[in-house]
């Protein structure tokens, strides 16, 4: 099955749609690079966009080599900003967006929804995945 899948991808019969579930660092010294880290004292420096953090690496970029969610495809998608709608009688929020295939071939896109807890009785990760959906267009 594996070889057949690779052949179908190489010949364009299928479109790759996978995304990285982790960040890939430039070198081992950047590990861990993840969204599951809890909040620390490092804050972005807003005054100088070239020096985004209070600390930085001297020989490699601060950003990972391949960031979380990176993926390749034969097509391209656009996703509108999310729309939030609070339900009147329930303690829940509906979140929606529109996904459009702007490429020339059919494909699949993973739409992911993350939350950030600003104030909680316990320390929470910076971002937590709460919902995802695979859209074939």
Where are each of the predicted segments found?
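Conserved small/polar residues in nucleotide/adenosyl-binding loops
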Residues: 136-137
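Outer-membrane beta-barrel domain signature, especially the mid-to-C-terminal portions
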Residues: 126-130
């Amino acid at each position: 099955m594996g070889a057949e899948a690779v052949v179908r991808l190489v010949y364009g019969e299928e479109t790759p749609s996978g995304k990285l579930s982790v960040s890939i660092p430039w070198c081992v010294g950047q590990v861990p690079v993840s969204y599951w880290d809890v909040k620390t004292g490092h804050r972005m420096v807003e005054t100088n966009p070239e020096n985004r953090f209070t600390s930085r690496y001297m020989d490699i970029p601060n950003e990972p080599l391949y960031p979380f969610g990176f993926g390749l495809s034969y097509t391209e998608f656009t996703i509108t900003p999310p729309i939030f709608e609070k339900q009147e009688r329930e303690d829940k929020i509906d979140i929606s967006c529109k996904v459009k295939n702007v490429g020339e071939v059919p494909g699949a896109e993973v739409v992911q929804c993350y939350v950030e807890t600003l104030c909680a009785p316990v320390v929470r990760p910076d971002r937590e995945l709460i919902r995802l959906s695979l859209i074939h267009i």
